[in-house]
From Swiss-Prot:
Catalytic reactions on record: Endohydrolysis of (1->4)-beta-D-glucosidic linkages in cellulose, lichenin and cereal beta-D-glucans
GO MF terms held by the record: carbohydrate binding; cellulase activity
Function per UniProt: Hydrolyzes 1,4-beta-glycosyl linkages of 1,4-beta-glucans and 1,3-1,4-beta-glucans. Possesses broad substrate specificity for hemicelluloses of type II cell walls. Substrate preference is carboxymethyl-cellulose > 1,3-1,4-beta-glucan > lichenan > arabinoxylan > phospho-swollen cellulose > xylan > glucomannan. May participate in lateral root development.
Swiss-Prot/TrEMBL keywords: Carbohydrate metabolism, Cell wall biogenesis/degradation, Cellulose degradation, Glycoprotein, Glycosidase, Hydrolase, Polysaccharide degradation, Secreted, Signal
Entry EC no(s): 3.2.1.4
Protein name: Endoglucanase 2
Tissues where this protein is expressed: Expressed in roots and flowers.
Gene: GLU5
Induction remark: By auxin in roots (at protein level).
Active site location: 93, 428, 480, 489
Organism: Oryza sativa subsp. japonica (Rice)
Family the UniProt entry places it in: Belongs to the glycosyl hydrolase 9 (cellulase E) family.
Lineage of producing organism: Eukaryota, Viridiplantae, Streptophyta, Embryophyta, Tracheophyta
Leading EC class: hydrolase
Gene3D superfamilies per record: 1.50.10.10
Mitochondrion is among the record's keywords: no
């Protein structure tokens, strides 16, 4: 369990005010190497998403790309009379912990909400959406009744006693449940946040599924709010692994914020505002964001609502949230008067030895999001007689942290497995460190794994591609040893926020013009458009262009039907790259489609006789329905 993220080590000093003064932007302490193309953010993005396939539990799909994994946990929930097959293992072990899993899915969804266009341009949006759905499908199973949530499968104590592949595990698979007699407002609230955020991702491509997720979210929020309590008081076996040190106030606010964004229902904005003081949203100044402490995320979401003009009569309260968001940014930048995040000599944000990188990736994502929504504005800091930090400075600092992770550090080590020339070879991970069951099908027992595999010298036999490990200590030192779990264990919540900022950086480092996707999401429509309307301003437009027009209309049974012709073109210059694996999403469609084939999991693909689009070429399809034009967009592709 690469946890180490409890609030026990978090500075929670109440921040009473932020002075309004100006300080000229000082040069960064460390200039990252990636500004001129030193890092391949697109490759890192692809790997960061690929890692989640190594963490899958359940029946693996035909699209599985991590070939050394196989089916596992196929009886999960059976003893409890419920199907709990699926979901994700949290880190290097075989337990399904609900709190970090839900936070992981929330952050994956937020990454797509903010940077889905950029992921599509990199050809990774389809993989990102698939990773989200793997989690939400499991949560739907784990929430069989409005006031019941299965919070964990397996337990850390028995799991840590064994070193086994997930395909072989003989450890306890007991399922632990929350209900009115055994409440868990923190875990139910985080799961509500995950389902609400994910509903935005699927709103246009799969509206029925989005509705289901939103319904789960609303029920879970009501359950969390009505039956209050810490989940680790109800499920004590979780306490030593993912204890809820910060309590549940942050998750209740977090869930209400996501429900407001997903539904536009003012009740959730009212909750966010009316409970701002009582639940700590405008009281706590915190510079750490992760699976336990959600306050900075809530504060930046609330600031985003304010900046978008969605605060309504609660603008004053949301200003209080924004001041705390400013504190978080200033503390990361080292510009607060009293409470700045520490840094290593090499410039990495530093909180703790155990899995410190989780806080680096989450902070970098929050800073990038805040930067993009400031729209040329600035945050106001209280340090050094007063200072401001512009949006560009926030993004530049976030980029420096990502560059550090990818290898721009004193050791020249990439902390993403499989990226760069030097990266961890002995990740603390059961499945990666034991020969694949496909290559060596002989059963590996509980203790045999420790005797034969755990202590082996040399690299793991299976590449944990894309995994971001815990990272170096406060001196930038790192020991690539399997038993050094504080530094070499990766976790899903390390990667989830990194997906978003890698997509942002892959598209460019300058100011981001928010096109159709951003506008749609502000209205609760998660349409992953990469083909923007004519005249839309977007710095990093996709080479794939979509045009549609009505070609015929007729009356039948009192209704007017329209035939629409859609052309999909590769606008790359002559001799340029070919578009392959093109996936198309269609929303608000109420009739048949000709000229496309249904994709395996969602959306559409080009027909088998047109598998690719060379530069300058086009493909066409038509649809008929009695409605205005459908929403048509690109959800993913590869340029080769």
């Amino acid at each position: 369990m690469a946890r180490g993220g409890g609030a026990a080590g978090v500075s929670m000093a109440h921040h009473l005010g932020i002075a309004l003064v100006v300080l000229v932007f000082a040069a960064m302490a460390q200039v990252a190497r990636g500004g001129g193309g030193g890092h391949d953010y697109g490759m890192a993005l692809s790997k960061s998403i690929l890692y989640f396939e190594a963490q899958r539990s359940g029946v693996l799909p035909g699209s599985q790309r991590i070939a050394w994994r196989a089916n596992s946990g196929l009886a999960d929930g059976k003893a409890n009379g419920v199907d709990l097959v699926g979901g994700y293992y949290d880190a290097g072990d075989n337990v399904k912990f609900g709190l970090p899993m839900a936070f992981t899915v929330t952050m994956m969804a937020w990454s797509v909400i903010e940077y889905g266009e950029e992921m599509a341009a990199a050809g990774e949006l389809g993989h990102a959406v698939e990773a989200i759905k793997w989690g939400t499908d499991y949560f739907a199973k784990a929430h069989p009744e409005p006031n019941v949530l299965y919070a964990e499968v397996g337990d850390g104590d028995s799991d840590h006693n064994c070193w086994q592949r997930p395909e072989d595990m003989t450890t306890s698979r007991q399922a632990y449940r929350l209900d009115p007699q055994n409440p868990g407002s923190d875990l139910a609230g985080e799961t509500a946040a995950a389902m609400a955020a994910a509903s935005l991702v699927f709103r246009s491509s799969n509206p029925g599924y989005a509705d289901q997720l939103l319904q789960h979210s609303k029920q879970l929020f009501d359950f969390a709010d009505k039956y209050r309590g810490r989940y680790d008081n109800s499920i004590t076996v979780a306490r030593n692994y993912y204890g809820s040190f910060s309590g549940y106030g942050d998750e209740l606010l977090w869930a209400s914020a996501w429900l407001y964004q997903a539904s536009d229902d003012r009740r959730y904005l009212d909750y966010l505002a009316n409970n701002a003081d009582a639940l700590g949203g405008t009281g706590w100044s915190i510079n750490q964001f992760g699976w336990d402490v959600k306050y900075p995320g809530v504060q930046i979401l609330a600031a985003k609502f304010l900046l978008q003009g969605k605060a309504g009569e609660h603008a004053g309260v949301l200003q209080g949230y924004r001041r705390k968001a400013d504190f978080f940014a200033c503390s990361c930048l080292g510009k607060d008067a009293a409470d700045n995040v520490g840094r290593t000599p090499g410039g990495m944000l530093y909180h703790q030895r155990w899995n410190n990188i989780q806080f680096v990736t989450s902070a970098s994502f929050l800073l990038a999001v805040y930067s993009d929504h400031l729209a040329g504005g600035a945050v106001r800091c209280s340090g050094g007689g007063g200072a401001v930090a512009g949006a560009a400075e926030l993004l530049a600092f976030a980029k420096s942290q990502v560059d550090y992770i990818l290898g721009s550090n004193p050791r020249g080590t990439s902390y993403m497995v499989g990226y760069g020339a030097v990266y961890p070879r002995q990740a603390h991970h059961r499945g990666s460190s034991i020969a694949s069951i496909r290559a060596s099908p002989s059963f590996v027992s509980c203790r045999e794994g420790y005797a034969s595999w755990y202590g082996r010298r040399g690299g793991n036999p299976n590449l944990l591609d894309g995994a971001v490990v815990g990272g170096p200590d406060e001196h930038d030192d790192f020991a690539d040893e399997r038993n050094n779990y504080e530094q070499t264990e990766a976790a899903t919540y390390n990667n989830a926020p990194l997906m978003g900022i890698l997509a942002r950086l892959a598209a460019g480092h300058g100011a981001r013009a928010r096109g159709r996707l951003g506008q749609s999401l502000q209205h609760g429509i998660a349409a992953n458009h990469t083909s923007l309307p004519h005249g839309a301003n977007h710095q990093h437009a996709s080479p794939v262009e979509i045009e549609q027009k009505a070609t015929a209309s007729w009356e039948k049974d009192g209704r007017t039907y329209h035939r629409y012709a859609v052309t999909v073109s590769n606008r790359s210059p002559a001799g340029g790259k070919t578009v392959e694996e093109l996936h198309i999403g269609i929303g608000k469609l109420y009739g048949p489609v000709w000229g496309l084939e249904k994709a395996a999991r969602y959306g559409y693909v080009l027909p088998s006789w047109t598998p690719s689009l060379p530069a300058g070429e086009s493909a066409a399809f038509v649809y008929v329905h009695a409605a205005p034009p459908a929403d048509v967009w690109v959800t993913g592709y590869k340029l080769v």
